[in-house]
Amino acid sequence: MAPSPTPSHSRRLDKKKFTHVSSEEIARGEHMSLAKYKYVDATGSQKIWEVAERCQKPKSTESDSVCALPILRRMLKYDCLVLVKQYRPSMKAFTLEFPAGVVEPQDGTSEVSALRRLNSQTGYTCTGLKQTSPLTASDPVHTSCTTKLVSVEVNGDDLRNLNAQQKFGEGEFYEVVQIPMNDVLQRLNDYSEDGYVVDSRVYAFALGLSMGAQMGARRT
């Protein structure tokens, strides 16, 4: 596929001129470490960047974390986006997020890990695996962490989901939140006004839904 065109006013970057030189760990905790990366930029100058790294990294080409995007479908009810509410010490606040987590060695693939996280955090069982993203950056400014997004369908009328049960690990606390698909953006804004911090991926998803609906309305 041909690359997307670059507008005439934009600088063009030569990928060959940017090179990673070395990594040096300068601090290490139980789950995260801080490293100093040396790299060469387009001018040929050597620069330093501080990067947070995950201590547990996958040995394969899989991402080090996954994020499930579940849509709950039930007879005679609105389709709902399934999120989890939890307290995040780093934010000093409660957040609204997609079911997500680190890929464990026993998972094997991102899809298996995403379905396991969905089931443990929400109690729901996936009834339709839709799409898996390529490797994406979690926060490319500050960390080397990567994630894959896995979109899934949950049949709420399935017996397993009628009897859904969360499976918490030690120190884990999740509350399931179901938001009608026709009102996601407004509901997230309401949660934000109430002091919740919405994960940027969730909000970007909601914006995409809203923009898609507006563009579709203009064409009709």
Label every PLM stretch briefly.
Residues 40-43, 139-161:
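Active-site-adjacent beta-strand/loop module that shapes the phosphate/pyrophosphate-binding cleft
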Residues 24-25, 54-56, 134-139:
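Short, solvent-exposed loop/turn elements at beta->coil junctions and helix N-caps
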Residues 1-44:
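N-terminal presequences and immediately downstream first alpha-helices
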Residues 125-133:
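A short coil-to-beta-strand element that immediately follows conserved catalytic motifs
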Residues 2-3, 61-71, 76-116, 134-137, ...:
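Conserved Nudix-box catalytic region and its N-terminal flanking loop in Nudix hydrolases
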Residues 2-7, 11-20, 94, 143, ...:
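Nudix hydrolase/Nudix homology domain
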Residues 26-69:
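Acidic, metal-coordinating catalytic segment for phosphate/diphosphate chemistry
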